[in-house]
Amino acid sequence: MTPGSIQRTLVCLSLGLGLVPGAVTAVERSIYGLNEYIELFDLNLQVAAKLDTGAKTASLSARDIERFKRDGDDWVRFYLAIDEAHEHPIEKPLARISKIKRRAGDVAANDSKTYTARPVIELDVCMGSALRRIEVNLTDRSAFQYPLLVGSEALKAFDALVDPGAKFVAGKPGCTIAANSAE
């Protein structure tokens, strides 16, 4: 099934629901592929990302992550762990600390800690023509193919449906900062 045929099917289904008394019509959703190009507005960088409905939060590949205080507020300093990224430190306000469940294979038999604590920042990200502010946790993803993983919370912000058989459906990001809204 092509992305266009999926969209037509969804439209037909939503129109058909309107014929059934008391039925709720479908919300207009954007269809994205398993992988999409995403622009990280705050960092002036475009990356290929994996869209993962099984992950709750988004994760960005970062290294040398350290928390610090600035004017009494919590901040985080890090370097992007992405080949084409800049080699200067990035500093952002810390939104919160996220507890991420560790995979069973990553936990030693004598280790009782089943989660890792990761700093979370907010970033303006563009996918297709949609610009949203999402939470992103920082971790070293250099062992993975994609430096950015977009989880279900961010996908909800984009009103996204993910077609796992498609890739780069939205094309190159095309947002302006003036278009930012979570409407």
Where do the model's predicted regions map?
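N-terminal secretory signal peptides that target proteins for export/translocation
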Residues: M1-S5
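Bacterial N-terminal signal peptides
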Residues: L10-V20
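Pepsin/retropepsin-fold aspartyl endopeptidases
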Residues: T25-E183
